[in-house]
Design a protein with these regions (language model features):
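Active-site loop segments of alpha/beta catalytic cores
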Residues: 1-42, 82, 88-94, 106-352
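ATPase catalytic-site recognition across NTP-hydrolyzing enzymes
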Residues: 100
Length: 352
């Protein structure tokens, strides 16, 4: 079974030859340390991202397209960039802060124009689709993450409560761009789409239910329908945090998979598999707060085995950390995770 077939089979809730494995992102520092290389410390790099996944025996890659434009340096030497959405931010390469938000006031929401989709080229998706047998996810943004990054998180949340109509309008405009982005990524060869949209704290959703039903869920439904009108592919949601109170809504929106399942936020994968495993393919749940970053390789092995036991039966599970292989993950722990997945994740070996 090829990597692409393995992931597609799991997403269809059937058992492949082995539990598929992969990461939504692998940070540059981790990749360079594992490979002994000095690839650029940037978010995405084809050769680095290919080599590190090959080294770990990973089955999928997740690539987006996030254009930004260099505006020069500020008085402190920080680089100033303009995103595709129109906000401007200062960046050190590993962090950023807004210097000019998407709109100065909510009164500008009506005059704000949806970004030009011609900015999206899909080059990395096209490269992976052409040269590798890995399953290729194309990632786009969701209404919450885009606006909290372009306005500031606190400013976004206040506006969602006090200027709900304007936030709804801005969300519609940025999601029009994201829908067009998804179409470009699919035409470039993406096999499925992931909507990256962090909507919850570790304690529960960012926004109250009545606001979610105004500025989040209807837009998810529209976005999924728009993507599927272009091509009938699986559409999944990535969100960190505690989603248990809104899992019914996630399913009702039309998502067919969920990534993160953050255990430190109380996401119990056995319970989620029991309640939602027929509707959602599950990706993630390997802890980053302690297990991958501070535990021993032997502890990592035991957690991987118990997670596979809880979630892999009947298909519908893909082994992954609950976010990304970040720089603070020791190489030995990543190798332990993926080696265990290769050995213990064989369906005919375990009898699942």
């Amino acid at each position: 079974m090829t990597k692409k077939e393995r992931v597609a089979t799991a997403l269809a809730h059937r058992e492949p030859d082995r539990v598929p494995m992969g990461e939504m992102s692998i940070e540059a520092g981790f990749a360079n340390r594992l490979l002994g290389t000095s690839f650029p410390v940037v978010y995405q790099n084809y050769e680095r991202d290919r080599q590190v996944r090959e080294s770990l025996g990973i089955d999928y890659v997740n690539m987006g397209d996030w254009p930004s434009y260099d505006l020069g340096l500020d008085q402190h030497g920080y680089r100033i960039c303009r995103s595709a959405y129109g906000d401007e931010y200062a960046t050190t390469g590993s962090s950023r802060h807004i210097v000019k938000p998407l709109v100065a006031t909510m009164d500008e929401a009506r005059s704000y124009r949806s970004p030009d989709p011609r900015q999206i080229k899909g080059e990395l998706v096209r490269a992976f689709a052409a040269d590798e047998d890995m399953f290729v996810f194309g990632q786009i943004g969701g209404p919450v993450t885009i606006l909290d990054e372009c306005l500031g998180m606190e400013e976004y949340m206040i506006a969602a409560l006090e200027s709900t109509d304007e936030i709804q309008l801005l969300s519609e405009k940025v999601l029009t761009f994201e829908a067009e982005k998804a179409k470009v990524l699919l035409d470039a060869g993406a096999d499925a789409i992931i909507v990256g949209d962090d909507i919850a704290f570790n304690s529960g959703p960012f926004l109250p239910p009545k606001i979610m039903h105004r500025v989040v869920y209807p837009l998810y439904k529209w976005l999924i329908a728009e993507i599927k009108r272009h091509k009938d592919v699986k559409v999944l949601l990535h969100s960190d945090g505690q989603l248990t109170p809104i899992m019914d809504e996630v399913v009702a929106c039309g998502f067919e998979g969920l990534h993160s399942l953050q255990p430190s936020a109380g996401m119990d994968i056995a319970e989620i598999k029991h309640r939602y495993g027929d509707a959602l393919a599950l990706i993630g749940n390997i802890d980053l707060d302690y297990v991958m970053t501070r535990a021993s390789p032997a502890e990592v092995e035991q957690v991987v085995k118990s997670t596979i036991d809880a979630a892999a039966h009947g298909g519908g599970y893909i082994l992954s950390t609950c976010n990304a292989l970040v720089d603070s993950v020791p190489s030995a722990n990543a190798l332990a995770m993926y080696d265990t997945g290769h050995r213990y994740g064989m369906y005919h070996h375990t009898g699942r």
